[in-house]
């Protein structure tokens, strides 16, 4: 079973990492090519392209200029510890054990506009490049064209290895639509399951964005801590009051609901 999540805009490169274990990203050559394209843009162009304020655009232009290989623990940080948004608050990576990180390294992947796909312990340098950014490149007008079938093929290899090892060849999509689109679902050869998280509000269950993002992180953490290897194990997710709702779930969508009475 393989889990995919989105990255985060917020980053934490100040807090020392809780583990020394680190690996190199698989798509550094591609990341370097994209950085080269971004370096050609002025702060004003970056602000327009990414809908950023002038200070944020200037910050990211400086990041592109500083970006360089090789990645080391002195100039980069493990991806699962570097991202710091709502999903990562729920995942709470700093409290994971070394064994947890080792399991996550095999079963969790982070989709990224710049790095393509990251393992939890892959070193990364700070950046801002959302997958939906219309950044022209040699392969097309946006990052979906740039990554093409690359990420789907990588996931297919991972899932085939899971199956060959006697595991469950199921991809659990905990990423946003923007990011999972880059995985080219039509090219994926394994079963895809998408968990949905709903909260009771205004007399009905609905998806509340902040809570849903946090819940994706909570489920990722649940899978890591409990070494979840199959769909039945996933249905046991019960963090922070959520519970599996079989009556509104199906083979492709697992719905988890929470109601605070």
Swiss-Prot record:
A Pfam entry, by short name: H2O2_YaaD
CC terms in the record's Gene Ontology section: cytosol
Disulfide bond positions: none
GO BP field: response to hydroperoxide
Family classification: Belongs to the UPF0246 family.
Listed PANTHER family: PEROXIDE STRESS RESISTANCE PROTEIN YAAA, PEROXIDE STRESS RESPONSE PROTEIN YAAA
Protein known as: UPF0246 protein AZOSEA34360
